Protein backbone atom coordinates (compact mmCIF):
# COMPACT_ATOMS: atom_id res chain seq x y z
CA UNK A 1 0.00 0.00 0.00
CA UNK A 2 1.50 3.33 -1.06
CA UNK A 3 0.76 6.38 -3.14
CA UNK A 4 4.51 6.78 -3.67
CA UNK A 5 5.04 3.68 -5.80
CA UNK A 6 7.98 5.26 -7.62
CA UNK A 7 9.69 6.38 -4.41
CA UNK A 8 9.16 3.60 -1.88
CA UNK A 9 8.02 -0.03 -1.89
CA UNK A 10 5.58 -1.91 0.34
CA UNK A 11 8.42 -2.91 2.70
CA UNK A 12 9.40 0.69 3.32
CA UNK A 13 12.54 0.54 1.18
CA UNK A 14 13.35 3.64 -0.84
CA UNK A 15 13.64 2.94 -4.55
CA UNK A 16 15.80 4.47 -7.30
CA UNK A 17 14.11 7.76 -8.17
CA UNK A 18 15.97 10.29 -10.29
CA UNK A 19 15.52 13.98 -10.85
CA UNK A 20 16.45 17.61 -10.26
CA UNK A 21 15.21 19.98 -7.58
CA UNK A 22 16.02 23.22 -5.85
CA UNK A 23 15.94 22.92 -2.07
CA UNK A 24 16.95 24.69 1.11
CA UNK A 25 18.31 22.63 4.00
CA UNK A 26 17.20 22.82 7.63
CA UNK A 27 19.87 24.57 9.67
CA UNK A 28 22.55 22.07 10.65
CA UNK A 29 24.75 23.82 13.20
CA UNK A 30 26.15 21.83 16.11
CA UNK A 31 23.19 22.34 18.44
CA UNK A 32 20.58 21.45 15.82
CA UNK A 33 22.14 18.21 14.58
CA UNK A 34 21.10 16.34 17.73
CA UNK A 35 17.52 17.59 17.40
CA UNK A 36 17.33 16.30 13.83
CA UNK A 37 18.87 12.98 14.84
CA UNK A 38 16.28 12.65 17.60
CA UNK A 39 13.48 13.16 15.07
CA UNK A 40 14.83 10.41 12.83
CA UNK A 41 15.33 8.06 15.78
CA UNK A 42 11.81 8.60 17.12
CA UNK A 43 10.39 7.63 13.74
CA UNK A 44 12.65 4.61 13.22
CA UNK A 45 12.79 3.18 16.74
CA UNK A 46 9.12 3.33 17.77
CA UNK A 47 5.84 2.00 16.40
CA UNK A 48 5.92 4.90 13.94
CA UNK A 49 8.53 2.98 11.94
CA UNK A 50 6.03 0.17 11.40
CA UNK A 51 4.10 2.45 9.06
CA UNK A 52 6.52 5.17 7.95
CA UNK A 53 10.03 4.89 6.55
CA UNK A 54 12.26 7.65 7.99
CA UNK A 55 14.39 9.83 5.77
CA UNK A 56 18.00 10.49 6.85
CA UNK A 57 18.11 13.58 9.07
CA UNK A 58 20.92 14.94 6.90
CA UNK A 59 18.43 15.30 4.03
CA UNK A 60 15.74 17.32 5.83
CA UNK A 61 14.89 20.19 3.51
CA UNK A 62 12.22 22.47 2.10
CA UNK A 63 11.64 22.32 -1.64
CA UNK A 64 11.92 25.67 -3.38
CA UNK A 65 11.10 24.38 -6.87
CA UNK A 66 10.59 20.94 -8.37
CA UNK A 67 12.68 21.20 -11.52
CA UNK A 68 12.24 17.84 -13.21
CA UNK A 69 11.59 14.26 -12.14
CA UNK A 70 12.78 11.62 -14.60
CA UNK A 71 9.63 9.54 -13.99
CA UNK A 72 7.31 12.40 -14.98
CA UNK A 73 6.34 13.88 -18.33
CA UNK A 74 9.25 15.82 -19.88
CA UNK A 75 9.29 19.57 -19.29
CA UNK A 76 9.53 21.73 -22.47
CA UNK A 77 13.36 22.02 -22.64
CA UNK A 78 13.70 18.26 -22.18
CA UNK A 79 11.00 17.61 -24.74
CA UNK A 80 12.81 19.80 -27.28
CA UNK A 81 16.04 17.96 -26.59
CA UNK A 82 14.40 14.59 -27.23
CA UNK A 83 13.04 15.82 -30.57
CA UNK A 84 16.32 17.37 -31.65
CA UNK A 85 18.27 14.24 -30.74
CA UNK A 86 15.63 11.74 -31.87
CA UNK A 87 15.45 10.22 -28.41
CA UNK A 88 12.37 8.00 -28.24
CA UNK A 89 12.42 7.32 -24.53
CA UNK A 90 13.95 9.05 -21.53
CA UNK A 91 15.26 6.55 -18.95
CA UNK A 92 13.71 6.92 -15.50
CA UNK A 93 16.74 5.62 -13.61
CA UNK A 94 19.42 7.88 -15.03
CA UNK A 95 20.01 11.61 -15.09
CA UNK A 96 19.98 13.57 -18.33
CA UNK A 97 23.12 14.35 -20.29
CA UNK A 98 24.83 17.38 -18.76
CA UNK A 99 24.15 19.63 -21.76
CA UNK A 100 20.34 19.24 -21.67
CA UNK A 101 19.68 21.62 -18.77
CA UNK A 102 23.13 23.12 -18.23
CA UNK A 103 22.28 26.66 -19.39
CA UNK A 104 19.04 26.54 -17.41
CA UNK A 105 20.92 25.57 -14.25
CA UNK A 106 23.44 28.39 -14.70
CA UNK A 107 20.63 30.95 -14.91
CA UNK A 108 18.85 29.39 -11.93
CA UNK A 109 22.00 29.47 -9.79
CA UNK A 110 22.31 33.20 -10.45
CA UNK A 111 18.77 33.64 -9.11
CA UNK A 112 19.48 31.50 -6.04
CA UNK A 113 22.43 33.70 -5.09
CA UNK A 114 19.99 36.60 -4.62
CA UNK A 115 18.03 34.79 -1.91
CA UNK A 116 18.64 35.76 1.74
CA UNK A 117 21.24 33.38 3.15
CA UNK A 118 18.76 32.24 5.80
CA UNK A 119 15.04 31.77 5.20
CA UNK A 120 13.19 32.22 8.49
CA UNK A 121 10.45 29.81 9.58
CA UNK A 122 7.62 31.36 11.61
CA UNK A 123 5.13 28.50 11.83
CA UNK A 124 4.75 24.77 11.10
CA UNK A 125 1.62 22.65 10.62
CA UNK A 126 1.95 18.89 11.09
CA UNK A 127 0.60 16.35 8.57
CA UNK A 128 0.66 12.54 8.66
CA UNK A 129 -1.73 10.93 6.13
CA UNK A 130 0.64 10.26 3.21
CA UNK A 131 3.89 10.99 4.97
CA UNK A 132 5.19 12.68 8.09
CA UNK A 133 5.97 16.32 7.60
CA UNK A 134 5.13 19.94 8.21
CA UNK A 135 3.65 22.69 6.08
CA UNK A 136 5.99 25.66 6.36
CA UNK A 137 5.17 29.32 6.91
CA UNK A 138 8.04 31.75 6.31
CA UNK A 139 8.41 35.31 7.51
CA UNK A 140 7.33 37.99 5.04
CA UNK A 141 10.80 38.79 3.70
CA UNK A 142 11.67 35.13 3.14
CA UNK A 143 8.28 34.31 1.61
CA UNK A 144 8.48 37.22 -0.83
CA UNK A 145 12.01 36.21 -1.83
CA UNK A 146 10.95 32.59 -2.44
CA UNK A 147 7.89 33.70 -4.40
CA UNK A 148 10.08 35.88 -6.63
CA UNK A 149 12.56 33.02 -7.09
CA UNK A 150 9.80 30.60 -8.09
CA UNK A 151 8.53 33.03 -10.72
CA UNK A 152 12.04 33.32 -12.14
CA UNK A 153 12.47 29.53 -12.12
CA UNK A 154 9.16 29.04 -13.89
CA UNK A 155 10.48 31.17 -16.76
CA UNK A 156 13.87 29.43 -16.79
CA UNK A 157 12.57 25.85 -16.68
CA UNK A 158 9.37 26.65 -18.62
CA UNK A 159 6.87 25.24 -16.12
CA UNK A 160 5.36 26.73 -12.99
CA UNK A 161 5.49 23.84 -10.49
CA UNK A 162 1.98 24.95 -9.56
CA UNK A 163 1.17 22.17 -7.08
CA UNK A 164 4.01 22.88 -4.66
CA UNK A 165 3.12 23.93 -1.13
CA UNK A 166 6.11 24.74 1.07
CA UNK A 167 6.81 21.75 3.28
CA UNK A 168 9.44 19.57 4.94
CA UNK A 169 9.10 15.76 4.81
CA UNK A 170 10.58 13.48 7.49
CA UNK A 171 9.19 10.08 6.43
CA UNK A 172 6.99 8.44 3.80
CA UNK A 173 4.02 6.20 4.55
CA UNK A 174 4.35 2.64 3.23
CA UNK A 175 1.77 0.69 5.25
CA UNK A 176 -1.89 1.45 5.95
CA UNK A 177 -2.36 3.20 9.28
CA UNK A 178 -4.25 1.26 11.99
CA UNK A 179 -6.77 4.00 12.77
CA UNK A 180 -9.47 2.29 10.68
CA UNK A 181 -8.85 -1.44 11.10
CA UNK A 182 -6.21 -1.76 13.82
CA UNK A 183 -6.59 -2.77 17.44
CA UNK A 184 -7.24 -0.24 20.18
CA UNK A 185 -3.73 -0.84 21.52
CA UNK A 186 -2.13 -0.16 18.13
CA UNK A 187 -4.11 3.04 17.67
CA UNK A 188 -3.24 4.29 21.13
CA UNK A 189 0.46 3.43 20.81
CA UNK A 190 0.81 5.13 17.43
CA UNK A 191 -1.11 8.21 18.54
CA UNK A 192 1.11 8.52 21.62
CA UNK A 193 4.31 8.44 19.57
CA UNK A 194 2.93 10.82 16.93
CA UNK A 195 2.10 13.33 19.65
CA UNK A 196 5.70 13.05 20.87
CA UNK A 197 6.84 13.73 17.32
CA UNK A 198 4.60 16.78 17.02
CA UNK A 199 6.14 18.24 20.20
CA UNK A 200 9.59 17.56 18.83
CA UNK A 201 8.78 19.16 15.47
CA UNK A 202 7.37 22.23 17.20
CA UNK A 203 10.90 22.99 18.40
CA UNK A 204 11.80 23.69 14.76
CA UNK A 205 9.69 26.84 14.75
CA UNK A 206 11.87 29.91 14.31
CA UNK A 207 14.63 27.79 12.77
CA UNK A 208 16.12 28.79 9.46
CA UNK A 209 16.65 27.17 6.06
CA UNK A 210 20.07 27.54 4.46
CA UNK A 211 22.37 26.19 1.72
CA UNK A 212 19.93 26.94 -1.09
CA UNK A 213 21.06 25.11 -4.19
CA UNK A 214 20.11 22.91 -7.12
CA UNK A 215 20.39 19.24 -6.24
CA UNK A 216 20.31 16.02 -8.20
CA UNK A 217 18.76 13.02 -6.47
CA UNK A 218 18.69 9.29 -7.20
CA UNK A 219 16.32 8.40 -4.37
CA UNK A 220 14.54 10.23 -1.60
CA UNK A 221 17.54 9.50 0.63
CA UNK A 222 20.35 10.83 -1.61
CA UNK A 223 20.77 14.44 -2.70
CA UNK A 224 23.85 15.78 -4.47
CA UNK A 225 24.58 19.51 -4.93
CA UNK A 226 24.95 20.31 -8.60
CA UNK A 227 28.48 21.59 -7.91
CA UNK A 228 29.46 17.99 -7.13
CA UNK A 229 28.96 17.14 -10.79
CA UNK A 230 29.59 20.37 -12.65
CA UNK A 231 31.98 22.38 -10.46
CA UNK A 232 34.27 23.29 -13.32
CA UNK A 233 31.51 24.47 -15.63
CA UNK A 234 28.91 26.03 -13.33
CA UNK A 235 30.88 27.83 -10.63
UniProtKB/Swiss-Prot annotation:
Gene3D superfamilies: Cyclic phosphodiesterase. SUPFAM superfamilies: LigT-like (SSF55144). InterPro entries: 2H-PEstase_DUF1868, Cyclic_Pdiesterase. It comes from Invertebrate iridescent virus 6 (IIV-6). Pfam families: 2H-phosphodiest. This is Uncharacterized protein 127L.
